[in-house]
Amino acid sequence: MEKAEFQVIIVGGSIGGLTLAHCLHRAGIKHVVLEKASDPAPQIGASIGILPNGARVLDQLQLYDQVEEHIEPLSKATIGLPDGFNFSSSYPKIIDQRFGFPIAFLDRQKMLEILYKGYPDPSKIRLGQRVTSIESLDDGVLITTTTGHVYRGDLLVGADGVHSIVRREIWKARGIARRVSKIKQDSSKLTVEFRCIFGISSAMPGLKLGEQVNALFDGLTIVTIHGKDGRIYWFVIQKLGKKYVYPDSPRYTSHETSIAAEEIRDVKFYENITFGELWDKRETSSMTALEENTFKVWHHGRCVLLGDSVHKMTPNVGQGANMAIEDAAALANLLRKMRISSGPYFPTSSQMEFLLQKYRDLRYERVNTIYQSSRFLVRFQVRDGIIYSLLSRYWAPYAGDLPADMASKTIADGTMCDFLPTPKRSGGGWEKYSKQGRSWSYLTQLMIYLFGLTIVYTSLTMMFDLEGALKFYFLQV
């Protein structure tokens, strides 16, 4: 059947949603973005980390120069432990040297503003369009919003975050298709074990530009990133007393946020600087539950997900937004190839199903590996139990370049737009640390390393005291 023009409806003017709009514009594919908020770039107190794999796509879209105006590249990280021991790592600088892009943070508001203002046709980004209903047709989807507007498209993309209405529609449709047990199992795996107070503070004496501080405590971690003009991006992650299953996860008011902050006011996170001093300098702040999961179901019919709507991770690895950016590039790559191969004809439902399954297959393993890294790191940084406590005190200080190597292996296989030129700024790390160049994943290597640690630790504790045994082991490796 001949069609006028294939159209993609993107629900959510998020980082991933707006990046997809840019990618589709470059690919020549008709699209529209429906954003429920009236402000395309609200200030909610959040920051965003742009790592080389996300930066590379933004550079392809000619947006990274604007990002660079608002960042202070990280060069050093300082890690502090409860007993007063601290050490430094130059892994941020190493990453910059390996990939040609730094690890950098900026206001999430500013990133959204860059994506929104940098888009060439604002009429395609519809604000104040909260989706109220989604109707799946044989050859498309029909979307109705609170304003009464009706949008018809050939593909619906849910870039609408962890509380995604598109994901609910996919679960509903899959359930009707008699996959109820699988959907219930998938939906129940979105869990919450941590909460995060996050915010942005003005410059403080003693916190140097381009540096990051990770203060590790039992059940708590405080992270600060010192950005452009001394602007401090920070988050405090705390272990909760119980495990919640979505959607029964806690929601927090501003009053509850203030109470939680006051409870840790006197905690020193760097030298003699207390969290209370950082809190008093805040420009904006909030508190949220940290959901965790990579869903197995990514699509149904003509509906598909990207970003936090399908994979939600804690902020510790800084890859959440970068994964959404990669999702956008991967989906745009496939849609462009489909458009070229289909010519003037619209692809059949089975062809669309094949394309969306291919998108899921291309992304799932990579996203899930980084998600597992996030699960490991958040528990490591809050010293969640004896193993993580031992690792933070007796493994991390002696790990050398291993943290940089681990990060490099998650960065190197990043997806970019295959129909746009590769950025000129680059480094040898993309090839050296790519999956093709290694036989084991870094998590496998880490598990083998930790298994060896366990055996040696057990043997040594028979002869030495605990601290002496661990120091002896790490001085030998």
UniProtKB/Swiss-Prot annotation:
Binding of FAD occurs at E35, G49, R108, D308, A321
Active site location: R195
Species the sequence originates in: Penicillium paxilli
Q: Where in the cell is it found?
A: Membrane
Listed GO molecular functions?
Answer: FAD binding; monooxygenase activity
Identify the main location. membrane
- Protein family: Belongs to the paxM FAD-dependent monooxygenase family.
Q: In which pathway does it act?
A: Secondary metabolite biosynthesis
Report membrane topology. Answer: Multi-pass membrane protein
The phenotype of cells or organisms lacking this gene is: Impairs the production of paxilline.
Q: What is this protein called?
A: FAD-dependent monooxygenase paxM
Write out the entry's keywords from A to Z. FAD, Flavoprotein, Membrane, Monooxygenase, Oxidoreductase, Transmembrane, Transmembrane helix
